[in-house]
A protein has these predicted regions:
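Cationic, low-complexity basic patches in intrinsically disordered or flexible, solvent-exposed regions
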Residues: 6, 11-12
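Acidic, low-complexity intrinsically disordered regions
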Residues: 15, 20-257
C-alpha cells in the first residue's frame, strides 16, 4: 500500500432496500440464481471496468502495470463483439481516464496516465466506479444494457485512505450487482491475502487471485484477467471455471511467500 421469480414489470426499490448509489429498478431477475436471466440485453456487448491501484508502493511496477493493461486491451480490441472500456486509477483519490470508450478507441496507457504515488483509497475508487456504471445501466433502455459487465480490480496493499465509501457499503453494492445483475468482479492482489480481502467486500473467493509483487507476477495477473474476460465473453459467467487463473496460481504457489 502507499503511505502509511421472474419480474414482468419494473419494481421500484426503496432507499432502505437499495445499496448506496444504486436507487433504481430491478428488471426481470431470478432471485434463485446468481447470474442474469435471459433478457433483451445488447448481445455481444461487454462493459469492462478497470480499477487499478497507483499508490506509492506500485512505483516499481509502473512499467509492468502499463504493459499488462495495454496487453489486455490489445487482445480484446478485436474479435467478435464490442467492448466498452472504463478505467479508474486510484491512490488517495480516484481518477477516471476512460469513460465507456470503445476498446478500439482507447490509446495505449503511458507513464503520463499512470504515475504511482500516495495512499490506497480502494473503497472510494470501487464505490465510485460501481455507482457510475450502475447509474448508466439504470437509465438505459433494456436492449442497450451490456450482456456482460466485468470489473478488474488490482491492488498491492491494504485500504488506508477512503472517506466516501466504507467497506460495508461497497460490500452491499458488489453483492447487489453480482446477485441481481450478473456482474463479475475480479480481485487481483499482491502483498495481501486476496481471498480474505475480496470476501470482505463481497467478491466471490474463486474470483480472487494472489500474485507475486514483481514483473513476472504482474504479467501473470494481467494474463489471468485477460483469460477471464475472454471466458466471460464466450460463456456468460465464470461459475465452476478456474482455468483462467491456473497459471497465476501455480506461479504464486511456487514463488509466493
Amino acid at each position: 500500500m502507499g503511505c502509511g421469480k421472474l419480474f414482468r414489470v419494473k419494481q421500484r426499490l426503496t432507499r432502505s432496500e437499495t445499496p448506496p448509489g444504486i436507487i433504481g429498478t430491478v428488471i426481470r431477475r431470478n432471485r434463485n440464481k446468481n447470474y442474469t436471466e435471459e433478457r433483451k440485453m445488447k448481445k455481444d456487448l461487454t462493459e469492462l471496468v478497470f480499477v487499478l491501484d497507483r499508490s506509492g508502493s506500485m512505483e516499481h511496477l509502473t512499467g509492468d502495470t502499463i504493459g499488462g493493461f495495454n496487453a489486455v486491451l490489445k487482445e480484446h480490441r478485436n474479435g467478435e463483439g464490442e467492448v466498452l472500456v472504463t478505467t479508474y486509477l486510484f491512490n488517495d483519490t480516484a481518477s477516471m481516464i476512460h469513460d465507456r470508450l470503445p476498446a478500439a478507441e482507447v490509446k495505449p496507457m503511458t507513464e503520463k496516465d499512470y504515475c504511482a504515488c500516495g495512499c490506497t483509497a480502494l473503497m472510494d475508487a470501487l464505490g465510485t466506479a460501481i455507482r457510475h456504471i450502475a447509474g448508466i445501466h439504470r437509465y438505459a433502455r433494456e436492449e442497450d444494457i451490456p450482456e456482460h459487465t466485468i470489473f478488474v480490480i488490482t491492488t498491492d496493499g491494504m485500504e488506508n485512505a477512503s472517506h466516501s465509501f466504507s467497506a460495508e457499503e461497497v460490500r452491499k453494492m458488489v453483492k447487489h450487482e453480482q446477485e441481481k445483475y450478473g456482474w463479475e468482479f475480479l480481485f487481483l492482489a499482491s502483498n495481501i491475502d486476496a481471498v480474505e480481502n475480496a470476501e470482505h467486500i463481497g467478491i466471490r473467493r474463486e474470483n480472487a487471485v494472489d500474485c507475486c509483487p514483481d514483473a513476472a507476477g504482474t504479467e501473470m495477473l494481467y494474463n489471468a484477467a485477460s483469460r477471464a474476460i475472454g471466458n466471460i465473453r464466450g460463456r456468460k459467467n465464470l461459475a465452476g471455471d478456474t482455468s483462467w487463473r491456473n497459471e497465476a496460481d501455480r506461479d504464486f504457489h511456487n514463488r509466493g511467500k
